[in-house]
């Protein structure tokens, strides 16, 4: 409940929070989404097993992913599979050259963003993920070696957490969060970050 209040204060109306509170909310928002959504799915799967049928797994420790592609293999698997099978592959997937592959990724993730909501903020969220995947493909194409696994996990988590900013109520609210963090002069009480560190240590 405590962290729900912190997150609601940052992701709701224009935030009037310390830098520590905003940072804690940014780093925890996706974890709260994951535990809530995955928890409901796990209960549904358990109920299904009790009734004699098996529902597919929809989350597979997404925050253990060491790159963004792996994150999407683990996060909301039913949605990512649908996007792959019915949008990305019909567009040509990776079969029509590197440039077309990049365009297909951007289109697929733009539509993924729109699936989550009709606002411009959700479109930007989808395009951020698509652009990041294109960037990673470009790095791989020129022979850049992957990061150390622990650093890769950290960077993936930070990027995903940053992108969740655009799940705020609207694009102006998302901009307000970014602006409030940039303008914050007082870091504030670090107790939120201390508790957050314990939570993240348990997850990772």
Name these PLM-found stretches.
Residues 1-202:
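Membrane-embedded transmembrane alpha-helical bundles that form the catalytic cores
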């Amino acid at each position: 409940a405590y962290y729900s209040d912190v997150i609601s204060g940052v992701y709701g109306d224009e935030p009037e929070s310390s830098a520590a509170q905003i940072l804690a909310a940014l780093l925890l928002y996706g974890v709260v989404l994951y535990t809530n959504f995955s928890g409901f799915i796990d209960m549904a799967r358990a109920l299904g097993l009790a009734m004699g049928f098996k529902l597919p797994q929809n989350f597979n420790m997404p925050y253990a992913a060491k790159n963004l592609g792996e994150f999407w293999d683990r996060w909301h698997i039913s949605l990512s599979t649908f996007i792959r099978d019915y949008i990305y592959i019909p567009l040509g997937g990776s079969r029509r050259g590197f440039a077309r592959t990049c365009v297909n990724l951007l289109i697929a993730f733009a539509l993924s963003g729109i699936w989550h909501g009709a606002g411009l903020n959700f479109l930007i969220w989808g395009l951020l993920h698509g652009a990041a995947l294109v960037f990673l493909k470009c790095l791989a194409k020129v022979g850049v070696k992957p990061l150390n696994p622990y650093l890769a996990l950290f960077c993936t988590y930070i990027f995903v957490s940053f992108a969740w900013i655009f799940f705020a109520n609207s694009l102006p609210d998302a901009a307000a969060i970014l602006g409030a963090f940039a303008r914050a002069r007082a870091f504030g009480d670090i107790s939120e970050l201390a508790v957050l560190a314990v939570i993240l240590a348990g997850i990772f």
